[in-house]
Amino acid sequence: MRLLGLDIGSKTVGVSVSDELGITAQKLETIKIDETKYNFGMRPLKKLVRQYEVDGFVLGLPKNMDGTSGASVARSKAYGKRLEEKFGLPVHYSDERLTTIESRRVLVEDAGIHDRKKRKQVIDQMAAVLILQNYLDLHRKD
């Protein structure tokens, strides 16, 4: 089963994809969105769904550190509902607390990307990878 992982932000959506066996996640791209113009990035997502023959989505659920839900959780769930309506595919959610911080650490410490502009270009994709990989690891059938 192939899934797209999404890190939903206010201006961008980081996108990752799983392999066909649902074992690993890899980064794909960052899609610019503009909620004020009702541009939610559905056109580029449609291309990716077709290209990778996707079976569903995994969205990050940005809960507060104490486990409560805030406005960002509502945004992710609303985005998930749009995806279900547009594509008719299942949408799953994965706790994304600290994924952006972890992404930044990986990019600086492991990949050696110290340039802030370069990091900004891939941080949403990396967060999407972590969201999807966490989901895959939790749901792996050994």
Curated annotation (Swiss-Prot):
SMART domains on file: YqgFc
Domain of life: Bacteria
Enzyme Commission no: 3.1.-.-
Cross-referenced Gene3D superfamilies: YqgF/RNase H-like domain
Organism: Lactobacillus helveticus (strain DPC 4571)
Record lineage: Bacteria, Bacillati, Bacillota, Bacilli, Lactobacillales
An example Gene Ontology molecular-function term: nuclease activity
Keyword Hydrolase assigned: yes
Subcellular location: Cytoplasm
Name of the protein in question: Putative pre-16S rRNA nuclease
